[in-house]
Structures are given as structure tokens and as C-alpha cells.
């Protein structure tokens, strides 16, 4: 029975390089000299921590990061941007999570989308992915097209296509 997996995975190496390039640019830019501006990646937690002297500076760092990620070929929709919080004195911090794997709510949304369109395929939620199975390859390709058209806020990809 033909099947494919709908996944949400990012290339952490490219994200790490983009964060390192962001930190390098922060160090060389004149408007960040003598400030607490920094960017670092915690690979275990898949978090990017931005530190700055104020909300405006955090936004500037975020713009640099988005630019570097785009140049590296990483979709910025992988970023789950957190709130800006004060960490003492005039400094502020923002934690941005790097999405990896489809969350349960999003997987249920994909599953309901497929069931709601009464397609001849079944969607099963597995750890961090949604497996779609069907009798015909054409049905699976129609399901892929439907998912791409309806779900715009996630950079989903399809892999493990079996015939």
C-alpha cells in the first residue's frame, strides 16, 4: 500500500551557521559596539537566545538572524518566536525555538483536513510526523497538493514515499 510521511524538520547545521554568522556580524557592527547584544544557539534545547539592551536592539538582531537564515536556505517559518523579557538592568532576552517535528495539535489539523475532504487516504499521527497511506499513488499526490495548499504557516516537507 503506497504511503508517505509529512514531516517538519530543519537542518540544524545551517541554523547553527546562521546564528554564528549573526553573532559575528553583531561583533563587527558599529551600532552594537559596547552593548550586550548577542546571539547563541542551544542545540540540545533547539533554542536561539537573543540578548540586547532593548526591544529595538532585539528586533535588529532578529532581522540580521532572519537575513542569515534566508541566505542559508532555511525557511524562517521554522522559528517560533518567544516574548521579549527583562533579565536585569536594561538588558532584555528573547528565546526563539527552532521547530522540529510536527506538534500534536498541528498533526491533528492535518489529519482533520484529509478526513474532511473525504479523500481515499488515511492519515495516522506518529511521533513528530503524519503518515498518509492510500490505495493509489494518485490519491497520495492529491493529498500532498491539498496539504501544501491549505497549510501555509508550516514549512512541511514530504519524505519516505513508498509505492
UniProtKB/Swiss-Prot annotation:
It holds the Pfam family DUF520. This is Nucleotide-binding protein Pnap_1080. Belongs to the YajQ family. Keywords: Nucleotide-binding. CDD domains: YajQ_like. The keyword rRNA-binding does not apply. PANTHER family: UPF0234 PROTEIN YAJQ. GO terms for molecular function: nucleotide binding. GO terms for cellular component: cytosol. Disulfide bonds: none annotated. InterPro entries: DUF520, UPF0234_N, YajQ-like_sf. HAMAP family: YajQ. The keyword Nucleotide-binding applies. Nucleotide-binding protein. It comes from Polaromonas naphthalenivorans (strain CJ2).
Amino acid at each position: 500500500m503506497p504511503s508517505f510521511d509529512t514531516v517538519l524538520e530543519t537542518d540544524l547545521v545551517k541554523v547553527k551557521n546562521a546564528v554564528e554568522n549573526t553573532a559575528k556580524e553583531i561583533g563587527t557592527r558599529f551600532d552594537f559596539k559596547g552593548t550586550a547584544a548577542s546571539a547563541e544557539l542551544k542545540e540540545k534545547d533547539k533554542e536561539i537566545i537573543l540578548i540586547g539592551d532593548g526591544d529595538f536592539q532585539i528586533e535588529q538582531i532578529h532581522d540580521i538572524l532572519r537575513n542569515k537564515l534566508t541566505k542559508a536556505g532555511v525557511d524562517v517559518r521554522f522559528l517560533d518566536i518567544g516574548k521579549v523579557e527583562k533579565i536585569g538592568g536594561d538588558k532584555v532576552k528573547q528565546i526563539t525555538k527552532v521547530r522540529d517535528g510536527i506538534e500534536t495539535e498541528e498533526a491533528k489539523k492535518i489529519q482533520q483536513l484529509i478526513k474532511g475532504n473525504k479523500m481515499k487516504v488515511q492519515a495516522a499521527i506518529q511521533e513528530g510526523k503524519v503518515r498518509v497511506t492510500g490505495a493509489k499513488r494518485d490519491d497520495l499526490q492529491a493529498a500532498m497538493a491539498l496539504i501544501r495548499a491549505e497549510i501555509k504557516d508550516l514549512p512541511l516537507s514530504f519524505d519516505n514515499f513508498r509505492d
